[in-house]
Amino acid sequence: MFSLQRLLGKEDKFFTLLEASAHQAHTSVQALVKFTKALDQQVHLDEFVHSRRKDKEITQEISEAVYTTFITALEREDIEQLSNALYKIPKTVEKFSERVLLAPQHVRGIDFSTQISLLERATNTLHDMVKSLRDGMDLERVKDLNEKLQYLEGEADKQMMVLYKDLFSGMHEPLQVIVLKDLYELLEKVIDRCRDAGNVISHIVLKNS
């Protein structure tokens, strides 16, 4: 049955879905905190799988709604670009946890807390940026939040240099160097995903200011 309301769409539908996706990104990092604190115990991927699947459902719902809604609060291309950028965050986090479980003997005793703390702050900042789309797209506020995100990415880059220095110090077995390098770079990629999503939001707000 034809529905004019469905065609026009609810004004806040996409904001709600994008905020839910940003929340899943932050939730996946919170699960990562618990995961890395329990590496000496039996750990499971359930939380990561649930978060990534939930975000995939949200992403699919956004994609379908974009093409079935006549009027959208944001441009369709912007909605899809941001949705895809957000989905890559829990997807990459899940990939990290899978790799850890492939070689647990090489990660016991390894401290990922500095990188993960930066990820927590980055996903929290990103969530605030997504919420700003509904709250009037305040350009100055979004600029401030994006600058914070860029700062966190810079701090993550510095931390990578510290980690590389340790890896190549000769204190680790060759196989462990390979494993840890891969894991460190996956965490770095998560914050890069946050940066990418933040840049999309900044572009949207600038275009609509």
Enumerate the language-model features and the residues they cover.
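Cytosolic, long alpha-helical scaffolding segments
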Residues: 1-209
